[in-house]
Curated annotation (Swiss-Prot):
Domain DPCK: from-to ranges: 4-204
Similarity comment: family membership: Belongs to the CoaE family.
Record: residues binding ATP: 12-17
Originating gene: coaE
Protein name, entry field: Dephospho-CoA kinase
Amino acid sequence: MTYVVGLTGGIGSGKSTVADLFAELGVSVIDADVVARQVVEKGSPLLAEIAEHFGEEILLADGSLNRTALREKVFADESQKQWLNQLLHPAIRREMLKQLAVQRAPYCLFVVPLLIENKLTALCQRILVVDVSEQTQLERANRRDNNQLALIKNIMQSQVSRAERLKYADDVINNDEDLARNLPQLKQKVLDLHHLYLQFAEIFNER
């Protein structure tokens, strides 16, 4: 069985950057955001169900999902968000577990933004949190998502607080610094954790 490190953090924390650095070291990465896109690909049964529920306006001209339109609908309405989560989360979980079952690497990274909120910590042997201040979250996500500040604040409110997330952490990467300046230090931190996780994985797999 593969040793599982759960990687999580709030919106704008830099989870994807950290996951990419692990991937560069040859670590297998199972990313919930990637899986979430796969399960609603154009022509999929789930996408058809979503379009039937919310209307054709959540589709782009080519028939694929308009993620921005869908996000705006669900984050403005708690009941709609719950409906979507009840549809998607089981499908995403099933697909991630399917990918995990075929892993043969010493350890893999389980990248899940809502790892704590969706009670997926039990699937992990260790939890790594990418931590930034709320101000950094807002600034980064606002730059990335073209000034959708109200939407970003809604997303942050739907996630556990920074303090709550850190309670679950076995390891923490502080990612508040500007990435361009901090990349060498970030790479070193990831490399150090990689060696640590290989040691833990060896012990885990000997049991």
